[in-house]
C-alpha cells in the first residue's frame, strides 16, 4: 500500500465508551475536514462541531482537532474527530469518511510507521508506544515512557557517535601507512575502544533489565502427581487459581498465571503430573507439559519431601533430568516441609538451587520468590531504565562481539583495516535499534504488531 494514501482508523478501543476517536492522516485529511465538518478548524484548537453525513445531516457532534503537517504526530496533515463512543455511531462516521476518494482504512501501526518514516520518532521510540500500551506493571509503564521520550535512543546514539569518532581516528591511521603502526600502538585507540566497550556493557545491563520488564520470565512447575505443583501455583499467585485435591492427576491441562515480583513479570505455568498414563486425556496433558518445559526459562522441579530424602535431582528422578533440554536452569523445590520438619531456606546441590518450603502453609514461598528474581538478574534498585525487546538485545550482543573482535585485531596484529571493519559492523548493529539501518521486512513485522489506530 502507498504511503501517499490518506488513512483513517479508530484510535480508541472497540466497544461502547464515553468518547470515540477517529484519526485521519495524509494529504486528503484537509478534504475530510471540509466535507465532514464544513470547514477547516483552527490548527491545534479544539472546535465543537457537528459531524455531517453525505446529505448534510448530522451523524454526531463532538470535538475536532486539526494538526497541519509537519507539526503533527505523523508529520502529515492529521485530523482527529472525538465523538460519542457508541460502535454504531463510530461505524457510520468511519463509513462516511471512506466515501471520499483517496481515503482507506489504516493498517496496524501505520500511523506510527509514518511518524518513523517522516523522522518524527526513531524505531526504538515507535516500539515504545506499543510497549507503553501493553505495559503490565507500573515499572514497565515508566520504563516504556522513558524509551518513548528517547532515553534508550540517546544511549545508543551516544555509542554510535563514539564509534564514529573512533573510526575516523583509525581510518586516518590507515591513510598514513608509514605511521599506521605508531598510531595503532600508542595506546589511545585501545583506551577509546575500551571506553566504548564499557559503555556498551552498561547499556546491555540496563537493556536486559528492560527486557525482563517487557517479556518477563517463563517458569514451569513440573514433577510427579501430588507433589504439590498446583498448591505452589496458588501460593505464588496469591489466589486459588488451580483446583487442589489429594487425587493424583487432578491437573490435566496447562494452567497459566501472570504475576509480578517487585515489578518483574512472571509467567507461572502449572502442568499435569508426569507419569506413565493410560488415560488419553491425562496423556495429552502430559505431552503439553513437556512442550511447556522445553520452552521454559526455568523449571521448578517439585518434589514431595515425604517420599524421598534425596536432594540431588539426578538421584530423585534421573529419567526426568535426562529428558530436560540442555542448559535449562532447574530449581529443586522440596515441598511439604511442614510435615517433614525440614529447615526452610535455600541451598546449592551440585550446581542446582534447592528450596525447602511448604506450598500448603506458604512457609518458605518468599524465599522462592526472591530466588526467582535473583536468578534472572533483576535489579529493583535500578533507577530510570528503559524497555528493550529481543531484537535490541541481539543487536547489542552483535555490536559487543564486533568490538571484541576489533580489539583482538588491534592488540594481536595491529591490523587497522580489520579493526575499522569491525567498528563499522558494530556501528551498523547499533543503528538497527533506532532504525537508521533496518530492512523493510523488519519494519513490516514491527509495525504490524501495533494497534490499528497507532
UniProtKB/Swiss-Prot annotation:
PROSITE patterns in the record: G_TRME (PS51709)
In this chain, (6S)-5-formyl-5,6,7,8-tetrahydrofolate is annotated as bound at 23, 80, 120, 454
Q: What does this protein do?
A: Exhibits a very high intrinsic GTPase hydrolysis rate. Involved in the addition of a carboxymethylaminomethyl (cmnm) group at the wobble position (U34) of certain tRNAs, forming tRNA-cmnm(5)s(2)U34.
Write down the top EC class of this protein: hydrolase
What name has this protein been given in UniProt? tRNA modification GTPase MnmE
Gene Ontology terms describing biological process: tRNA methylation; tRNA wobble uridine modification
Species this chain originates from: Salmonella typhi
Q: What is its EC number?
A: 3.6.-.-
Which is one Gene Ontology cellular component term of this protein? cytosol
Q: Which gene encodes it?
A: mnmE
Amino acid at each position: 500500500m502507498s504511503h501517499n494514501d490518506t488513512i483513517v482508523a479508530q484510535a480508541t478501543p472497540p466497544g461502547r465508551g464515553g468518547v470515540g476517536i477517529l484519526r485521519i492522516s495524509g494529504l486528503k485529511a484537509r478534504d475530510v475536514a471540509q466535507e465532514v465538518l464544513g470547514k477547516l478548524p483552527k490548527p491545534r484548537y479544539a472546535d465543537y462541531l457537528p459531524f455531517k453525513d453525505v446529505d448534510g445531516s448530522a451523524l454526531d457532534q463532538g470535538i475536532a482537532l486539526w494538526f497541519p503537517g509537519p507539526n503533527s504526530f505523523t508529520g502529515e496533515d492529521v485530523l482527529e474527530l472525538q465523538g460519542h463512543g457508541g460502535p454504531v455511531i463510530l461505524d457510520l462516521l468511519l463509513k462516511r469518511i471512506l466515501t471520499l476518494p483517496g481515503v482507506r482504512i489504516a493498517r496496524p501501526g501505520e500511523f506510527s510507521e509514518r511518524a518513523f518514516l517522516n523522522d518524527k520518532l526513531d524505531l526504538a521510540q515507535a516500539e515504545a508506544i506499543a510497549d507503553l500500551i501493553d505495559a503490565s506493571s507500573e515499572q514497565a509503564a515508566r520504563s516504556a515512557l522513558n524509551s518513548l521520550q528517547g532515553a534508550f535512543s540517546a544511549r545508543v546514539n551516544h555509542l554510535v557517535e563514539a564509534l564514529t569518532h573512533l573510526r575516523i581516528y583509525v581510518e586516518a591511521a590507515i591513510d598514513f601507512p608509514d605511521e599506521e603502526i605508531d598510531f595503532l600502538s600508542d595506546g589511545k585507540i585501545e583506551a577509546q575502544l575500551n571506553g566504548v566497550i564499557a559503555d556498551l556493557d552498561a547499556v546491555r545491563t540496563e537493556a536486559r533489565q528492560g527486557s525482563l520488564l517487557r517479556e518477563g520470565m517463563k517458569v514451569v512447575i513440573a514433577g510427579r502427581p501430588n507433589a504439590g505443583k498446583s498448591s505452589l501455583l496458588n501460593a505464588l499467585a496469591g489466589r486459588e487459581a488451580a483446583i487442589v485435591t489429594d487425587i493424583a492427576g487432578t491437573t490435566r491441562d496447562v494452567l497459566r498465571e501472570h504475576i509480578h515480583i517487585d515489578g518483574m513479570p512472571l509467567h507461572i505455568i502449572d502442568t499435569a503430573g508426569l507419569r506413565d498414563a493410560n488415560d488419553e486425556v491425562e496423556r495429552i496433558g502430559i505431552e503439553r507439559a513437556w512442550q511447556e518445559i522445553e520452552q521454559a526459562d526455568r523449571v521448578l522441579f517439585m518434589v514431595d519431601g515425604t517420599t524421598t530424602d534425596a536432594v540431588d535431582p539426578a538421584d530423585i528422578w534421573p529419567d526426568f533430568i535426562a529428558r530436560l533440554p540442555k542448559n535449562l536452569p532447574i530449581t529443586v523445590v522440596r515441598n511439604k516441609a511442614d510435615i517433614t520438619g525440614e529447615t526452610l531456606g535455600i541451598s546449592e546441590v551440585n550446581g542446582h538451587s534447592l528450596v525447602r518450603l511448604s506450598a500448603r502453609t506458604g512457609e518458605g514461598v518468599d524465599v522462592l520468590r526472591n530466588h526467582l528474581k535473583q536468578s534472572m538478574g533483576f535489579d529493583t534498585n535500578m533507577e530510570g531504565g528503559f524497555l528493550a525487546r529481543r531484537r535490541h538485545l541481539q543487536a547489542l550482543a552483535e555490536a559487543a562481539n564486533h568490538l571484541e573482535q576489533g580489539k583482538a585485531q588491534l592488540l594481536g596484529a595491529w591490523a587497522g583495516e580489520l579493526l575499522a571493519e569491525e567498528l563499522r559492523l558494530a556501528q551498523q548493529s547499533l543503528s538497527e535499534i533506532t532504525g537508521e539501518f533496518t530492512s523493510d521486512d523488519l519494519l513490516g513485522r514491527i509495525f504490524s504488531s501495533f494497534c490499528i489506530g497507532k
